[in-house]
Protein backbone atom coordinates (compact mmCIF):
# COMPACT_ATOMS: atom_id res chain seq x y z
CA UNK A 1 0.00 0.00 0.00
CA UNK A 2 1.28 3.45 -0.92
CA UNK A 3 0.43 6.28 1.45
CA UNK A 4 -0.41 9.71 0.02
CA UNK A 5 1.80 12.74 0.62
CA UNK A 6 0.85 15.40 3.17
CA UNK A 7 -0.22 17.62 0.29
CA UNK A 8 -2.58 14.97 -1.07
CA UNK A 9 -4.04 14.35 2.40
CA UNK A 10 -4.67 18.10 2.74
CA UNK A 11 -6.39 18.11 -0.66
CA UNK A 12 -8.58 15.17 0.39
CA UNK A 13 -9.52 17.01 3.61
CA UNK A 14 -10.49 20.08 1.59
CA UNK A 15 -12.53 18.00 -0.87
CA UNK A 16 -14.33 15.94 1.80
CA UNK A 17 -14.88 18.15 4.87
CA UNK A 18 -16.67 16.74 7.91
CA UNK A 19 -20.43 16.78 7.38
CA UNK A 20 -20.39 16.61 3.58
CA UNK A 21 -22.47 13.98 1.82
CA UNK A 22 -20.90 11.35 -0.42
CA UNK A 23 -21.93 8.49 -2.67
CA UNK A 24 -20.04 5.21 -2.93
CA UNK A 25 -18.76 4.68 -6.47
CA UNK A 26 -16.72 1.51 -5.86
CA UNK A 27 -14.64 -0.13 -3.19
CA UNK A 28 -11.97 -2.78 -2.89
CA UNK A 29 -12.90 -6.30 -1.85
CA UNK A 30 -14.42 -6.44 1.64
CA UNK A 31 -16.28 -9.68 2.40
CA UNK A 32 -17.87 -8.18 5.53
CA UNK A 33 -19.34 -5.01 4.02
CA UNK A 34 -22.89 -4.81 2.70
CA UNK A 35 -22.25 -1.47 1.01
CA UNK A 36 -23.08 -1.19 -2.68
CA UNK A 37 -22.32 1.44 -5.32
CA UNK A 38 -24.84 4.25 -4.98
CA UNK A 39 -25.05 4.08 -1.17
CA UNK A 40 -24.96 7.47 0.54
CA UNK A 41 -23.29 8.65 3.72
CA UNK A 42 -21.88 11.56 5.71
CA UNK A 43 -18.15 12.18 6.13
CA UNK A 44 -16.98 12.29 9.76
CA UNK A 45 -13.27 12.98 9.20
CA UNK A 46 -10.15 12.29 7.14
CA UNK A 47 -7.18 10.71 8.92
CA UNK A 48 -3.44 11.23 8.34
CA UNK A 49 -3.33 8.45 5.70
CA UNK A 50 -6.07 10.07 3.60
CA UNK A 51 -8.75 7.58 4.64
CA UNK A 52 -12.16 9.24 4.48
CA UNK A 53 -14.37 7.99 7.32
CA UNK A 54 -18.07 7.86 6.49
CA UNK A 55 -21.19 7.13 8.50
CA UNK A 56 -23.25 5.33 5.87
CA UNK A 57 -27.02 5.69 5.74
CA UNK A 58 -27.25 1.88 5.90
CA UNK A 59 -26.08 2.15 9.51
CA UNK A 60 -22.43 1.22 9.17
CA UNK A 61 -19.32 3.32 9.61
CA UNK A 62 -16.44 2.56 7.29
CA UNK A 63 -13.30 4.32 6.09
CA UNK A 64 -12.74 4.74 2.37
CA UNK A 65 -9.07 3.95 1.71
CA UNK A 66 -7.06 6.24 -0.57
CA UNK A 67 -6.32 4.49 -3.88
CA UNK A 68 -8.63 1.52 -3.15
CA UNK A 69 -12.12 2.88 -2.63
CA UNK A 70 -13.91 5.58 -4.60
CA UNK A 71 -16.53 8.08 -3.46
CA UNK A 72 -17.94 11.28 -4.89
CA UNK A 73 -19.61 14.35 -3.44
CA UNK A 74 -23.38 14.64 -3.75
Regions found by a protein language model. Give the residues of each.
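Basic/aromatic-rich interaction segments and small domains that mediate binding to polyanionic partners
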Residues: 2-74
Amino acid sequence: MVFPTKEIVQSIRETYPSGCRVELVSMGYDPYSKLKPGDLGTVTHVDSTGTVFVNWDRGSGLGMVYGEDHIRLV
